[in-house]
UniProtKB/Swiss-Prot annotation:
It comes from the Bacteria. Keywords: ATP-binding, Cytoplasm, Kinase, Ligase, Multifunctional enzyme, Nucleotide-binding, Pantothenate biosynthesis, Transferase. Its EC number is 6.3.2.1, 2.7.4.25. Residues 1-276 are annotated as: Pantoate--beta-alanine ligase. Its main location: cytoplasm. Coiled coil: none annotated. GO terms for cellular component: cytosol. In the N-terminal section; belongs to the pantothenate synthetase family. In the C-terminal section; belongs to the cytidylate kinase family. Type 1 subfamily. Beta-alanine binds at residue 58. This is Bifunctional pantoate ligase/cytidylate kinase. Transmembrane segments: none annotated. ATP binds at residues 27-34, 147-150, 176, 184-187. The lineage of its organism: Bacteria, Bacillati, Cyanobacteriota, Cyanophyceae, Synechococcales.
Length: 512
């Protein structure tokens, strides 16, 4: 279905009824990159609306607004074939009924436009923020699908949505590329056959940045110099080439974590942008918090959602506690504990149902480590310096290559202080007691009265936060997330969205 006026849009919206509504905003000249966005929206269920609007506000006077590709009939056919329910192609008066003179414009966060395209395209991101705010107001979607190719624009809109508390979920889609690596773009149509071959040098030069990093070059200046030389030697006119952090887009002097190597070049009459996410290892997500905050369940689901390995560090401490109890040892330093740790073998096996299997010296202790007896003693065992040292070393060895999500009480402060994202997941004592009771009941275990559970949880909080070795603390750079009133799925969605601001989908997608 093709919609043109605001009245057409409102009739279509009213006829749809409740349910998810996915908006894929475009400026037209659709290609397979747009089709991927539409297909991703289709897979999530609900209705899918594609908007086509060449926004005059985001073009500077000397840019290509007048000749920007316009082919509405082809766009309509591609959108429907990819799974859209309707395509809306409004006129400027539908989006901006008061005209430019009567328009209230929105400005992006200044830090997000201080680099990359911001300085060379004055007014561009103000135009983007303004038009997207109008589209969201008119459509009121539940989901907004955006490509990671325009990473700076994506970060600007994420901040806009968060700061203005708009009830819409942003869904990123990895950059799609041609066989030679050039990102799919409507502006590729400006390139002649010869220029098209020349443009392929852009992704090739950016890929050299990762090769230099792999060879040990972490300093920005020599890395940028080498990449720029490749571009200019190939005849590309470099508008900018910068190395910035992913969430705030601030310039970096060296690569210490995931970094964005981004460029804009001119090839003939076309201005092309591209980027490469540089990583020295796969990312780590650290989730800390007090007992009963739902860390294990959340971390397991987050790891699955992100395609990362789940490292249940809490289960490791429970495994040591269970083994001490099995042998009749007190939770204290001494030769018995040293001997136990010397022979300790903890191995995670395939998930059994929804829970990861833990083998302690070859014995399946998955259920045994979740009993009330183990829960009551695990904090004291975890406070023992030798236990802490032994398990921290094991965990750090597991994390040398990255690619994992770990949960515990000191993951972000002691085990993985260089984790790309740190979450401090918490909940009130009353909420955690209620969850603990439900968990015990689900396992057919005895359920104490809530007041007893609340006291036990408060006591454990005190022990965890006051112990001398690796006390429970929120890392200074951690994001606090209070989970009261939120479902597991809602908590997972928030954490995944935060992670995607630090690590793009395409950085973990071998096909991107």
């Amino acid at each position: 279905m093709k919609l043109q006026t605001s009245a057409d849009l409102q009739r279509w919206l009213q006829a749809g009824g409740p349910g998810p509504l996915h908006l894929v905003p475009t400026m037209g000249a659709l290609h397979q990159g747009h089709a991927a966005l539409i297909r991703a929206a289709r897979q999530q269920g609900g209705r899918v609306l594609v908007s086509v609007f060449v926004n005059p506000l985001q073009f500077s006077p000397n840019e290509d607004f007048a000749r920007y590709p316009r082919r509405l009939e082809e766009d309509h056919a591609l959108a429907l074939e990819a799974g859209a329910d309707a395509l809306w192609a409004p006129q400027p008066e539908d989006v901006f009924p008061a005209g430019a003179a009567g328009l209230t414009q929105l400005a992006p966060a200044p830090e997000l436009v201080a680099n990359l395209c911001g300085p060379s395209r004055p007014g561009h991101f103000e135009g983007v923020c303004t038009v997207v705010s109008r589209l969201l107001a008119l459509v009121q979607p539940s989901h907004l699908h955006l490509g990671e190719k325009d990473w700076q624009q994506l970060q600007v809109l994420r901040r806009l949505v968060r700061d203005l508390r708009w009830p819409v979920q942003i869904v990123p889609c990895p950059t799609l590329r041609e066989r030679d690596g050039l990102p799919l773009s409507s502006r590729n149509a400006y390139l002649s056959v010869e220029q098209r071959q020349q443009a392929a040098l852009l992704p090739q030069a950016l890929a050299q940045g990762q090769q230099l990093l792999d060879a040990g070059q972490r300093q920005a200046e020599p890395l940028l110099r080498a990449v720029r030389a490749l571009m200019e030697d190939g005849g590309l006119a470099v508008d900018y080439l910068q190395l910035v952090d992913l969430p705030r887009l601030q310039e970096l002097e060296q690569v210490t974590g995931p970094a964005l190597l981004a460029a804009a070049v001119r090839c003939g009459e076309a201005r092309l942008i591209d980027h490469r996410v540089l990583m020295s290892r796969l990312p780590i997500l650290a989730i800390d918090g007090p007992a009963g905050a739902g860390k294990s369940t959340v971390t397991r689901q987050v790891a699955h959602e992100l395609g990362l390995t789940y490292l249940d560090t809490g289960a490791m401490y429970r495994g040591v506690t269970w083994l001490l109890q099995q042998r009749g040892f007190e939770p204290q330093e001494g030769e018995p504990l040293q001997a136990l740790l010397a022979d300790l073998e903890l191995r995670f096996g395939p998930a059994s149902g929804t829970e990861q299997t833990l083998l302690v010296n070859g014995v399946d202790a998955t259920s045994a480590i979740r009993t009330a007896e183990v829960t009551a003693s695990v904090s004291a065992v975890a406070a023992l310096p030798s236990v802490r040292a032994a398990l921290t070393q094991q965990q750090q060895q597991l994390g040398q290559q990255g690619g994992l999500v770990a949960e515990g009480r000191d993951i972000g402060t002691a085990v993985f202080p260089d984790a790309e994202l740190k979450i401090y997941l918490t909940a009130t004592v009353a909420e955690r007691a209620r969850r603990r009771a439900a968990d015990l009941a689900a396992r057919s275990l005895p359920v104490p009265v809530l007041s007893q559970l609340e006291q036990e949880i408060a006591d454990r909080d005190h022990k965890d936060s006051s112990r001398e070795v690796a006390p429970l603390r929120q890392a200074s750079d951690a994001v606090e997330l209070l989970s009261d009133g939120l479902s597991i799925d809602e908590v997972v969605a928030q954490i995944v969205a935060l992670f995607r601001e630090w690590v793009p989908v395409e950085a973990l997608n071998a096909d991107a």
